[in-house]
């Protein structure tokens, strides 16, 4: 490449920095939109070679005086929102994509908010430039000029697509529509990329305003609240001409003057805030519907509805009542509230909408007052009713219905004039007599029905099949013992005891000595009538010590005798011991679940027929329990051995044995 071509390439590099900086600073300023004498970026501008676009700071000379031998630092251009002239009464907020407002600063507490940072550089240190192999003599100046024109067009398009351009257009529209424009401006600044960039007194680009971006997982080196764009670099023998930008995702800044109630931005700022403060206990609505309610020109009228239920004490809970011109009066007089929120701490729909714009409420006021009684000793608060409005409307209704009342009276007179149209009174009296007769017949059937119910209950309760099934289910299951039938059905229990029912199962139980019975556990030896324990009628414990009852003769209706050894340390006494007087009240018809206490010997039986009388012992349950608790050990066994002669329940003197 000749020296002439080198000079052309150096001149193109100088124009690259000059045009890039001028294009960014001009498009990003308000002068581009407001000034009629602003530069038009048309085809002629991109084709011609110019030295100066507009007044640029002197720092730009460092890049426009490039001679091909010196090292050029990166050119940095910052686009920022200038807040120096913003009064202290203004607040700055940022709106995200979900219309949530985030506080930025108040007044001019922060002087700037950095929106974008451009990086324009001549890169000759990167590996892509060093590894690039150019064929022939290199890129000609004509081809390089065409590539740079294409780069500038792409840069101009990119500038109009960034979020800061939308903010600039919004500020310009507000300034044109109002006499007093907001004292904020979008400006640019050219910096030397080799020097450190400080953010003291301003909000830098690396600082996120929306805190929700901290929860986003970011795998790149770019912060979550920023985005980055790069333009394809252009190759020269002196290095790669690069342009890149990092910018904020969200630039919808809102400015509100707290001293002016009718500020143009007050409605835009307060509208999302009302949406967020509405109680969540109300019926779910979309974001657009809530915005329409808050705006006066978008108010819609809904049909009011109410539902009543009784949660704890009688009280009505209604759904949202909205004005409706054609709807009738709601008789429930319920207000729109969240049932679990205090009215002073939550904002309901009644407080978010203007009451003066809703004159069509009849008997119901939309407010945030609790209206039903709870179970926490709170008094019932009635909703406020506009009595004067209701009376006025009733008076108007009466005036409008005078003509209808006259027509109705004429119709009634016409009916009274014809006796055949009047109802007969004799027919109604006959119907009353028939009805009273039916009631009397029904009342006469009640005694017979009651007697039939008692007979049926008696037959079911004394049925032996049901009794045996109940006892078998209790003996083989782990459920608690069921209660026996009432004592009224077993007045003659002694006469129903026959000979087979007095036989004892197994001969081994009859020959057991009385001394072996002494070794058994005191509590388990007691009969259930003395408060003892029936192992087969109780549930299993954590440490089972019971053995299964040996059922060798299932066909015989024998008297069950307990032979189960139980741990001597386990005394399981009944809380309410029964006396022997109540034995007849706890017996079924065909079985006698009676177990002999150990102080009485086993009854003597033979294979032949025998008759026995059953006598009531003189020992009571209270005496036996007190005797067991007072006497223990060997002394107690000795006392038992001394009284063996008085232990019989069945006496053999009354038995009539047949002669062989």
From Swiss-Prot:
Pfam families: ATG13
Coiled coil regions, renumbered to chain: none
Region of interest (Disordered), ranges: 315-369, 467-516, 572-597
InterPro entries the UniProt entry points to: ATG13, Atg13_N, HORMA_dom_sf
One GO CC term, this protein: PAS complex
Record's signal peptide: none
Keyword Transport: yes
GO biological process: cellular response to nitrogen starvation; Cvt vesicle assembly; mitophagy; piecemeal microautophagy of the nucleus; positive regulation of autophagy; protein localization to phagophore assembly site; protein targeting to vacuole involved in autophagy; regulation of cellular localization
Biased composition annotated in UniProt, kind: Low complexity: 321-335, 470-479, 504-515
MF annotations from Gene Ontology: armadillo repeat domain binding; lipid binding; protein kinase regulator activity
Family classification: Belongs to the ATG13 family. Fungi subfamily.
PANTHER family for the chain: AUTOPHAGY-RELATED PROTEIN 13, PTHR13430
Function, in words: Activates the ATG1 kinase in a nutritional condition dependent manner through the TOR pathway, leading to autophagy. Also involved in cytoplasm to vacuole transport (Cvt) and more specifically in Cvt vesicle formation. Seems to play a role in the switching machinery regulating the conversion between the Cvt pathway and autophagy. Finally, ATG13 is also required for glycogen storage during stationary phase.
Name of this chain's protein: Autophagy-related protein 13
Source organism of the structure: Candida glabrata (strain ATCC 2001 / BCRC 20586 / JCM 3761 / NBRC 0622 / NRRL Y-65 / CBS 138) (Yeast)
């Amino acid at each position: 490449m000749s020296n002439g071509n080198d000079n052309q390439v150096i001149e193109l590099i100088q124009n690259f920095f000059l045009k890039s900086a001028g294009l960014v600073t001009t498009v990003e300023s308000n002068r581009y939109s407001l000034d009629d004498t602003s530069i038009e970026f048309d085809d002629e501008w991109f084709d011609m070679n110019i030295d100066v676009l507009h007044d640029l700071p002197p720092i730009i000379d460092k890049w426009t005086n490039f001679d091909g031998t010196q090292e050029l630092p990166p050119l940095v251009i910052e686009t920022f929102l200038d807040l120096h002239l913003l009064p202290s009464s203004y607040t700055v907020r940022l709106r995200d994509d979900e219309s949530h407002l985030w506080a930025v600063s108040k007044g001019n507490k922060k002087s700037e908010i950095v929106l974008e940072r451009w990086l324009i550089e001549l890169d000759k240190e990167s590996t892509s430039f060093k590894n690039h192999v150019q064929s022939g003599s290199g890129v000609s100046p004509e081809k390089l000029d065409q590539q740079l024109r294409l780069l500038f067009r792409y840069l101009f398009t990119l500038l109009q697509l960034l979020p800061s351009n939308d903010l600039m257009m919004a500020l310009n529209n507000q300034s044109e529509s109002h006499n007093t424009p907001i004292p904020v401006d979008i400006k640019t600044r050219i910096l030397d990329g080799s020097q450190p960039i400080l953010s003291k007194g301003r909000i830098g680009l690396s600082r996120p305003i929306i805190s929700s971006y901290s929860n986003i997982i970011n795998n790149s080196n770019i912060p979550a609240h920023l985005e980055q764009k790069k333009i394809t670099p252009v190759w020269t023998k002196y290095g790669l001409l690069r342009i890149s930008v990092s910018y904020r995702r969200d630039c919808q800044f809102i400015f509100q003057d707290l001293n002016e109630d009718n500020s143009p931005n007050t409605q835009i700022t307060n509208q999302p805030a009302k949406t967020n403060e509405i109680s969540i206990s109300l019926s779910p609505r979309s974001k657009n519907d809530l915005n329409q309610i808050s705006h006066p020109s978008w108010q819609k009228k809904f049909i009011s509805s109410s539902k009543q239920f009784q949660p704890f004490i009688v009280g009505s809970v209604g759904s949202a009542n909205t004005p409706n011109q054609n709807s009738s009066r709601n008789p429930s007089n319920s207000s729109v509230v969240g049932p679990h929120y205090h009215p002073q701490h939550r904002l309901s729909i009644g407080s978010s909408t203007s009451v003066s714009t809703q004159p069509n409420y009849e008997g119901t006021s939309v407010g945030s007052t609790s209206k039903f009684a709870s179970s926490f000793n709170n008094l019932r608060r009635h909703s406020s009713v506009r009595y004067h409005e209701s009376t006025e409307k009733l008076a108007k209704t009466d005036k409008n219905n005078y003509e209808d009342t006259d027509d109705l009276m004429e119709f009634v007179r016409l009916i009274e004039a014809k006796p055949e149209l009047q109802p007969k009174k004799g027919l109604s009296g006959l119907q009353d007599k028939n009805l009273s007769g039916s009631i009397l017949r029904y009342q006469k059937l009640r005694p017979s029905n009651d007697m039939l119910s008692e007979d049926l209950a008696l037959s079911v309760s004394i049925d032996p099949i049901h009794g045996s099934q109940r006892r078998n289910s209790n003996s083989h299951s782990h459920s608690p013992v069921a209660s026996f039938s009432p004592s009224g059905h077993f007045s003659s229990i002694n006469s129903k005891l026959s000979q087979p029912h007095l036989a004892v199962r197994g001969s081994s139980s009859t020959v057991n000595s009385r001394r072996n019975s002494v070794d058994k556990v005191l509590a388990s030896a007691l009969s259930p009538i003395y408060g003892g324990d029936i192992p087969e009628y109780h549930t299993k414990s954590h440490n089972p010590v019971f053995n299964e009852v040996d059922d060798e003769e299932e066909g015989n209706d024998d008297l069950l005798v307990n032979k189960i050894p139980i741990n001597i340390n386990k005394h399981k006494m009944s809380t309410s011991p029964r006396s022997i007087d109540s034995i007849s009240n706890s017996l079924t018809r065909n079985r006698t679940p009676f177990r002999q206490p150990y102080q009485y010997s086993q009854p003597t039986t033979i294979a032949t027929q025998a008759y026995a009388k059953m006598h009531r012992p003189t020992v009571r349950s209270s005496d036996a329990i007190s005797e067991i608790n007072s006497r223990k050990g060997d002394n107690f066994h000795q006392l038992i051995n001394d009284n063996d002669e008085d232990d019989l329940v069945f006496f053999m003197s009354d038995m009539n044995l047949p002669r062989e």
